[in-house]
């Protein structure tokens, strides 16, 4: 192997290694622990799931395989319409992860895009929890 080929090989290997480190670090914030609960943050998982004005990430708090609560994270939805969706966040409280995944709450009239996005965020977050707990 020539010196130039060797440098090229090691340069590519170093870039691949850095990409792996960055991607591993990138997902470290999806599942965390707060106050003895497992918390799934859907910000990175659901960038493509949009409400009316953009993404609507949530934090899902889980303890002993039960959903304790779902919190909306900062988003760009119109506050007037997003306020209609807030009661939906309680739909999963107290349910086991399996029951929460199987449940299908009704879309909120007048905030269809936002409520649909919240439901999809919770679904993706709970599936991620099941796959990575």
Report residues per predicted region:
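Flexible, solvent-exposed loop/hinge segments and secondary-structure transition points
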Residues: 3-11, 19-116, 120-133
């Amino acid at each position: 192997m020539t010196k130039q080929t060797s440098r090229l090989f090691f340069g590519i290997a170093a870039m691949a290694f850095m990409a792996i480190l960055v991607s591993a670090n990138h997902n470290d914030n999806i599942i965390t622990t707060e106050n003895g609960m497992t918390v799934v943050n859907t910000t990175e998982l659901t960038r493509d799931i949009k409400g009316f004005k953009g993404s609507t990430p949530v934090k899902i708090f889980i303890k002993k395989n039960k959903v304790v609560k779902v919190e909306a994270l900062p988003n760009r939805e119109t506050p007037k319409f997003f306020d209609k969706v807030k009661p939906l966040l309680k739909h999963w409280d107290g349910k086991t992860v399996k029951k929460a995944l199987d449940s299908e709450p009704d879309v909120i009239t007048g905030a269809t895009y936002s409520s649909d996005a919240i439901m999809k965020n919770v679904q993706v977050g709970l599936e991620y929890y099941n796959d990575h707990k």
